[in-house]
Amino acid sequence: MAAKDVKFGNDARIKMLEGVNVLADAVKVTLGPKGRNVVLDKSFGAPTITKDGVSVAREIELEDKFQNMGAQMVKEVASQANDAAGDGTTTATVLAQSIIAEGLKAVAAGMNPMDLKRGIDKAVIAAVAALKELSVPCEDTKAIAQVGTISANADATVGNLIAEAMEKVGRDGVITVEEGQALHDELDVVEGMQFDRGYLSPYFINNQEAGSIDLESPFILLVDKKVSNIRELLPALEGVAKASRPLLIIAEDVEGEALATLVVNNMRGIVKVAAVKAPGFGDRRKSMLQDIAVLTAGTVISEEIGLELEKVQLEDLGQAKRITITKENTTIIDGAGEETMIQGRVAQIRQQIEDATSDYDKEKLQERVAKLAGGVAVIKVGAATEVEMKEKKDRVQDALHATRAAVEEGVVAGGGVALIRAASKVAASGLEGDNEEQNVGIRVALRAMESPLRQIVKNAGDEDSVVANNVRAGEGNYGYNAATGVYGDMIAMGILDPTKVTRSALQFAASVAGLMITTEAMITDMPAKDASAMPDMGGMGGMGGMGGMM
């Protein structure tokens, strides 16, 4: 086992704080409307330019192992804030740095670290309750656009695009961000349910120009198995032919004789039909077939529940207003399912989201909710260069997460004002700890809650102490707009922060800061010594006589 280097007490804490400061100082320059960019070197390709706090934090790795431990712990704050709310990473880092610096000063002065931590925790619990009281619901499109604009670093076009996307696909709709081909941003909305399976044969195509299959008011046959025998499909085909309406077959697969016969019937015009594979795999495929059944008021034909394909009636088939099938995708528009059934299914999937443990499962379940509840919107980010594209895409994704958080828990005044108001409320309530050291912990946390406002003002090139005093003297949403240098009502000026983002930033910062304040020893591997130099080759001197070989 390698030898270890151990540091105790103040020696350990000083090294740790040095690491925290390196990371936090690099991250906090990005905060606010006048935050600066950070350039990240990449091992290949062009450097990345970003104003995203968590992207900067993830790049930092320090040579000194003790400093690096401090930096990595604060990196965890940024990552957790990003995972929980999708934004607020820089705010969380600034808060953590402030709590750690003030807390370690108190520890160096001889205070009990455990009591300091308890005081900090008490202050944070009270501040979170105060933030919830200050929060107002974010319901209208204008407020959503404002949140998106602030999170995208005052880019109003991004805020408006996100608000428009949410309006079209609903609060639960899936909104994805992709790299576009144009110079400007675009919004592409897919109404209805879309899944990533295309036609099984190009001979089904009836819209030659678009290379797609368009079915008007079709029946939909949902089958949870492979279909290779045409006899199994005859009852369904005969029923549909009598009704003179098209048919879409969604099955695990349609192959061989069955597919060939469907193609021939379609080309001869006997029955208008198309076939696609069911989306997903295994249990997820069964669930998605059931989703389509609920959406279209159909029944999944499955031998597991005793339904046979040969005995299908027209009543078992789903229906929709229109279906479009391309080489890659199938879109079902305006299914015939009852709204109450669809909402029941959505509620059931939401419950599964709460119970799910893996992020991948949650994401897939969220997609299913969106497909049932509204639709899918794609924001295509436009830019002149690849470097700008990456930077802008990061900002749009941040803004999207922030707007979702705002819809979920409401909004508070932005620009660091909400934290100052929450701190004032806690101070006014006369919150006290069990002893003086806990009171110091409470004061450390409340003082740290001013740090995001101070950093925003510093980045704008103004005097932070003057602005902080002026904001503290005001009431309600009164704050400082760093972009214009004007004081006023932050919400009226459209400067909003999602409550969830502010709350998460404070909770995660206090959590990690509390752990670091109570650290008394740090252990790391000793640096490896260089391998000993190669032994000299003096014993080979006798080879000098080989000169005659030339």
Swiss-Prot record:
**One of this protein's Pfam families, by short name?**
Cpn60_TCP1
- Chief localization: cytoplasm
EC number(s)? Answer: 5.6.1.7
Keywords of this protein's UniProt record, alphabetized?
ATP-binding, Chaperone, Cytoplasm, Isomerase, Nucleotide-binding
Q: Can you tell me which residues bind ATP?
A: 30-33, 51, 87-91, 415, 481-483, 497
Which reactions does this protein catalyse? ATP + H2O + a folded polypeptide = ADP + phosphate + an unfolded polypeptide
User: Record's GO cellular component, any one?
Assistant: cytoplasm
Enumerate the subcellular locations listed in this protein's record, separating them with semicolons: Cytoplasm
Q: Which GO terms describe its biological process?
A: protein refolding
The GO molecular function terms of this record are: ATP binding; ATP-dependent protein folding chaperone; isomerase activity; unfolded protein binding
Q: Which PROSITE patterns match?
A: CHAPERONINS_CPN60
Q: Where along the sequence do coiled-coil regions lie?
A: none
Q: What does the UniProt record say this protein does?
A: Together with its co-chaperonin GroES, plays an essential role in assisting protein folding. The GroEL-GroES system forms a nano-cage that allows encapsulation of the non-native substrate proteins and provides a physical environment optimized to promote and accelerate protein folding.
Question: What name has this protein been given in UniProt?
Answer: Chaperonin GroEL
Q: Which organism is it from?
A: Photobacterium profundum (strain SS9)
